[in-house]
Amino acid sequence: MRRRLARIALIAIIVFGLGFGVNFYLNNYTGDGKGTPEEVLPVDRDYVWIDGPISEKAQRYFFFADGKYFGTALLTKNYKGWSDELSTSSLLPSTLAENKIAAAYSDSEILFGLIKASGEVKVTVNNHESKRIPLAELSKVAVELYNVQGYEIWYVDLAKLKEPKSYLIKVLDKNDSLLNELSI
């Protein structure tokens, strides 16, 4: 009886070890394996890339593509090199009114969108202030093609939000007065 239990335990340990090994291999030794994040970025469309948040193991880019799309791509680094892990895009919203949020997008890790900020405003999601990236660095050709003069990208890490099922996005002025809100 004891030998039977020992064999069952040994088999369970071997199966667990194999599962762990396969998971470790797939997470750390698969993917594109490029030397830099820029080498991994897709080139199948006419992209305009905008640097987003960066860490030692991940780099996020926002992008405009083909004159009508807006999205984000997440690149990750493992032992093999940099790989494209996740990307999402949607149609670029039509011209935005000042200090209005028309739409929000998500790739299950961040919530992001565009705003045409006028004056000192902040964008909050569930009372958590978002980070913003001004599009002033874009070339004049890109600004005209995508009609994003004066726009900024706002984003918030979903892991920092307490209630991930619903989001209340607010645009507040410098006195924290509500200018616009969107609930999703």
Residue positions per predicted region:
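Extracellular ectodomain segments of secreted/surface proteins
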Residues: 88-112
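N-terminal export/targeting and maturation segments
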Residues: 19-93
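Ser/Thr-rich low-complexity repeats and stalk/linker segments
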Residues: 45, 123-184
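Structural signature of eukaryotic scaffold interfaces centered on beta-propeller domains
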Residues: 51-55, 104, 161
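Hydrophobic membrane-insertion alpha-helices, especially the h-region
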Residues: 6-24
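Short, Lys/Arg-enriched, disordered terminal segments
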Residues: 1-10, 31-36, 173, 177, ...
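Short proline/glycine-enriched turn/loop motifs at strand-loop junctions of beta-rich domains
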Residues: 115-121
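Short, surface-exposed beta-strand/loop "edge" segments at domain boundaries and coil↔beta transitions
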Residues: 67-74, 93-95, 121-122, 163, ...
